Amino acid sequence: MQKHSNLENKILKLLNTEVMEERAKIPKKIMFELTNLCDLKCQFCSTHISKRKKGFMEFDFFKRVIDEAMNLGIEECALFTTGESFLHPEVMKFIDYSSQFDLYTYISTGGRCLSEELMDQILSSGLKSIKFSIDAGNEETYKIIKGCDVSLDNLHHTIKYLYKSRNEMKSDLNI
């Protein structure tokens, strides 16, 4: 264990306090719920039973919040909380806007809403990462967890297409 002098301890305490106070003032990540609609009924999620009014975030509100957050030094932008963001009819507008900044912009999806055309748009958008909610290792368990008639094989096909297209387009999207 390294010993510090009394003066060193005071300096370390002062530095740690100032650094922590400064970091605490400014959030580094912002998360958006683009919609609270979802095409699944996952066993672990309350979105499908929520009594909240269903709807979509307005782009002008999103733009205003992003602009203000950028002025505060935000570093990450998550385009999901509950709901399936790709059900929003203007999802690419949100992705394109947030991706134009020096932000690590990412999204999570169940994957059912992703057409090949939409995936190609995603690959050229500047989105940094897309995460897939898989939640099971076999078809039977997947259907139980997702709470509806879904296909794990279809999701695998979607992810494989995205990987193949990413390599062909030389995109830097993390999957």
Feature names for model-found ranges:
Residues 136-139:
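A glycine-centered beta->alpha junction motif in the catalytic cores
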Residues 132-134:
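Conserved phosphate-donor/acceptor-positioning beta-strand/loop module used by diverse small-molecule
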Residues 2-129, 141-145, 149, 153, ...:
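Conserved alpha-helical substructure of the radical SAM core
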Residues 105, 159-175:
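Conserved strand-turn element in the central/C-terminal portion of the radical SAM core barrel
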